[in-house]
Structure formats: structure tokens, C-alpha cells
């Protein structure tokens, strides 16, 4: 009976049904209430994060005293100049949101007149 007990103990941890203790630390689970994207490039605000933009780049900060997590998301632009300048807001005393869109630059140069 000692041999069966000994062979049962020699089975590596990855062959067991239970995950090893360190595997959960390697892949942290996503927080369920950060930010969810809806159609049209508009972001809905959920608990812990604030952010909304139509086209361009959005910087989103959550209220946290540890490390501020920043999400940079590029959304296809729906038109020229939908968002101009920057938008900032404070919610809960610690959250800030800003967004900006670069103006559209024409790809073709000036057309020369036939007289030139």
C-alpha cells in the first residue's frame, strides 16, 4: 500500500483538475464594471470609469489611489470636426476625461490653373 500512496503523490500538479495556486496571479480577471462600448463610437459610463467620445482618441481615468489605468481607444471618425478641443470632467473627485480629434488634412495639393 505504500507504493500506491507514493505513486499518487508523484503526479504533477498540472495533471490534477484543480489549477495551480500561481496560475490565477498570472492572468488577473477583468473588473466587470469598468467600461463597455456601444454602437456608434459612444462609450457608456459604468461604475468606476467615465468617458465618452465620437471619433478620435479618448483618455479615460478611473477613481483609484493606486495606479491610474488609462485606456486609449481609436474610433473611426464619423465626420470632420465632430469633437473639437478637449473635454474634461470630474466625478467622485478623482476622475478626469479628455478627448481630441485631429482636423482632416486634404491629401491633394493645390490645383494649378491652366494659365500658370
Curated annotation (Swiss-Prot):
Disulfide pairings: none
Bias (Basic and acidic residues) ranges: 1-28
Cellular component GO terms, alphabetical: membrane
Keywords, comma-separated and alphabetical: Dwarfism, Glycoprotein, Membrane, Transmembrane, Transmembrane helix
Membrane topology, from the record: Multi-pass membrane protein
Highest taxon of the lineage: Eukaryota
Record-linked InterPro entries: UPF0444
Region described as Disordered: 1-36
Transmembrane segments: 40-60, 78-98
Annotated compartments: Membrane
Residues listed as glycosylation sites in the UniProt record: 2
Family named by the database record: Belongs to the TMEM263 family.
Disease: Defect in TMEM263 may be a one of the causes of autosomal recessive dwarfism in Cornell K-strain white leghorns. A nonsense mutation truncates the protein and probably cause a dysfunctional protein. Autosomal dwarf chicken display small body stature by short shank length, with 30-40% reduced adult body weight despite normal hormonal concentration of GH and IGF1.
Biological function: May be involved in the growth pathway.
UniProt-recorded name of the protein: Transmembrane protein 263
Native source organism of the sequence: Gallus gallus
